[in-house]
Amino acid sequence: MSAPARRATPAATGTVVVMTTDTVTLTGLRAVYGTGTRRVTALDGVSTSFASGTFTAVMGPSGSGKSTLLHCAAGLDSPTEGTVTIDGTRLNDLGDNELTRLRRDRIGFVFQAFNLVTTLTAAQNVELPLRLAGRRPPAEDVTAALDAVGLADRAGHRPSELSGGEQQRVAVARALITRPAVVFADEPTGALDSAASRQVLRLLRGLVDDHGQTVVMVTHDPTAAAYADRVLLLADGRVVDELTGGITAAAVAARIAVREADPAGASRHAATLAGPSC
C-alpha cells in the first residue's frame, strides 16, 4: 500500500493564500530573545525556501539557530521579524486557534524522543492526533500510514514491544496520518544506533522519492545529511553555506571543516547568500 495521499486543506477564512511551488518559505526571519546584556539573536535575517517534494537537512554547531529555525518554520515559535509561509498560508496572519489547526492538519512532526503513549498500540498512537482533534480516522488510513513505514504487521504492538527504530517509524507514521504539507524532523536519529538510523533515514528519503513528501530535518550528523537533496549550514543565526547535488557525508564534513577554519570567509559567503540588504 502507498502512503496516504495529501489532502487539499482550505486556508483559514481571511488569511492570505499565495500559490507557490515551495511548500515552506521563510523571509527575513529574525528571532531575538532577552534584553540588555542577556539579549541573544538566534536568527539573523534568514531567507530561504523548501521546495515541494524535497528533502533538506539543516546543520550547524550548537547555538547556530538551527532548532530555532525549525521551530519558527513549523509555527511552534514566533519570529521577532519576518514571515513564514506554509503551503500558501502566511502563519503571521493566523490567530492562535487557526495556527493550532494548521499545525495539526498540515504539519507533521518527528522528534528525537519518540513521544509514544506507552499504554497504546502502534495503531492507536498513529491515530491519536486525529482523535485528540475529535476526528475518527478511517482504519484504512491508519493501516496505510503504518504500511508506508513498513510496520503494518506491528499495528497491535505497544512501544515496549518495539525496537527503538520501530518506535521512531511509528512516530513517522503518526506524522503522516494528517497527510501533511511538510514533515519537520528534529534530530530524528539522535537516540538510535547506526542500523536503526539508516532505517529511519531511508524511510524519510523514500517518502520524498516515492510520495512527493516535503521533509525538513535538523541534524548534527553528516551521514544523516547525506540523505538529503540539499544541506543548509547555519552559524550565528545565518545561513552561511549550502550544498546541493551529489551530497556525501564526506563532502558535508569537509565543508563544515572549511567553514570552521575560515569563519570570516563564511560570513562573507553568508552575506552573498542573503543577497543585498533592503
Q: Where on the chain are the PLM-derived regions?
A:
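Conserved catalytic motifs of ABC-family nucleotide-binding domains
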Residues: R179
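Conserved ABC ATPase signature
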Residues: R158-Q168
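ABC ATPase NBD coupling module
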Residues: T35-V40, L91-G108, L132, A249-A253
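The feature captures the beta-strand-to-loop junction immediately N-terminal to the Walker
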Residues: M59-P61
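Conserved ABC transporter NBD signature motif
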Residues: G82-D93
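Short coil-to-helix segment of the ABC ATPase nucleotide-binding domain corresponding to the Q-loop/switch region
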Residues: L120-L128
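Catalytic Walker B motif of ABC-type/P-loop ATPase nucleotide-binding domains
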Residues: V183-D186
